């Protein structure tokens, strides 16, 4: 079997969820498990959390069906609502909470003959300009849906654009726009994503929505996961499958972009961009062998990457290589590649086996 595995620590996942709850005492928390729990495996993540989680949030009906199979009694929120009229019938059968973000979705809901009322979360476009009603539009929709037979709870939800940039002016603007609607009779309100859970207590409302923090990555550029008390959930581990000596002046990898400046010892690692390791990782990016960092040498290939072992003479064939995890934070790798931890986690491909511990 190819020596590459993503080890998922479910104890760390539970720790991070409980940390989110500690940040917002007396609030409830939707664990955001969309995109296959950010690449970690939604069924396994939900099973690990279902005894402590107040609810789960996903992007679409197909994801909700998976979650319902793992957590028959859990509250499950469709963050983007339904994409066609027939989905409302299935949402009612599954007992979902749904976002309603425009007049078309409201029309579909009011026209539906449902087995049971749906808990509705009216989505405010408070400044991100992606989904949601304007302040006035939401007031109008609230009036339309209040008391409708298809509606159980009527709740309020919005999403921050810049909460991960502390002190950004737009965050205060979004809070103010959200506050304009709190005079309306809502059962529950939700606003805080991971960044706001960690640093904006005024945004916590009745329900928080921790996402990336559940998986042990930071939403901030300037605050590490360790500083925030988060534990990494996924460790991506390959192995040295070849070791060779490369003389001065010889190159390594596609494009001959890395050239040996000294007699070098080069290791080949069983991981590449087809596994989800970023091709954009530059030479010098660290991996960890025997607890010591060694740098990438040359371009990442589809199935392999090369590392410079010259300063780690004890490294040998078969040694484990941590691509990211507790010793090599995923956020550090993401920053080196000009991206974010979210993207790397969700891009770990299906050919990488997941191993669950805890």
Curated annotation (Swiss-Prot):
Question: What's the EC number here?
Answer: 5.1.1.1
What GO terms in the biological process aspect are recorded for it? D-alanine biosynthetic process
PTM N6-(pyridoxal phosphate)lysine: list the residues. 34
Cofactor (UniProt): pyridoxal 5'-phosphate
Could you name the active-site residues? 34 (proton acceptor), 254 (proton acceptor)
The record's section on Gene3D superfamilies has: Alanine racemase, Lyase, Ornithine Decarboxylase, Chain A, domain 1
Q: Which residues, by range, are in coiled-coil regions?
A: none
What species was this sequence derived from?
Answer: Stutzerimonas stutzeri (strain A1501) (Pseudomonas stutzeri)
What's its job? Answer: Catalyzes the interconversion of L-alanine and D-alanine. May also act on other amino acids.
- Please identify the protein, giving its name as recorded: Alanine racemase
């Amino acid at each position: 079997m190819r020596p590459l595995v993503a080890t998922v620590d479910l104890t760390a996942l539970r720790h991070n969820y409980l940390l989110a709850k500690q940040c917002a005492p007396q609030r409830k928390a939707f664990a955001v498990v969309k995109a296959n729990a950010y690449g970690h495996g939604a069924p396994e993540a939900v099973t690990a959390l279902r005894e402590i989680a107040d609810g789960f949030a996903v992007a679409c009906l197909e994801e909700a069906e998976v979650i319902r199979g793992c957590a028959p009694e859990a509250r499950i929120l469709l963050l983007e609502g339904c994409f066609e009229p027939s989905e409302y019938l299935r949402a009612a059968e599954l007992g979902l909470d749904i976002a309603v973000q425009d007049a078309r979705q409201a029309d579909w809901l009011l026209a539906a003959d449902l087995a049971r009322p749906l808990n509705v979360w009216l989505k405010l476009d408070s400044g991100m300009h992606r989904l949601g009603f304007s302040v006035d539009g939401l007031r109008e929709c609230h009036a339309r849906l209040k008391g409708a037979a298809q509606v159980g709870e009527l709740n309020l939800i919005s999403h921050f654009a810049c909460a991960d940039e502390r002190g950004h002016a737009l965050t205060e603007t979004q809070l103010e726009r959200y506050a304009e609607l709190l005079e309306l009779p809502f059962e529950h309100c939700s606003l805080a994503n991971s960044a706001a859970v960690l640093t904006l207590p005024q945004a916590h409302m009745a329900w928080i929505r921790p996402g990336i923090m559940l998986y042990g990555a930071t939403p901030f550029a300037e605050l590490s996961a360790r500083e925030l008390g988060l534990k990494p959930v996924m460790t991506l581990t390959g192995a040295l499958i070849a070791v060779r000596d490369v003389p001065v002046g010889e190159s390594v990898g596609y494009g001959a972009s890395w050239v040996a400046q000294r007699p070098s010892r080069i290791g080949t690692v069983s991981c590449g961009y087809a596994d989800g390791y970023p091709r954009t990782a530059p030479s010098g990016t660290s991996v960890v062998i025997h607890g010591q960092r060694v740098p990438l040498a040359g371009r990442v290939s589809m199935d392999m990457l090369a590392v410079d072992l010259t300063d780690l003479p004890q490294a040998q064939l078969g040694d484990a290589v941590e691509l990211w995890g507790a010793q090599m934070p995923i956020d550090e790798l993401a920053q080196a590649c000009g991206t974010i931890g979210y993207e790397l986690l969700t891009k770990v491909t299906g050919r990488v086996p997941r191993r669950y511990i805890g």
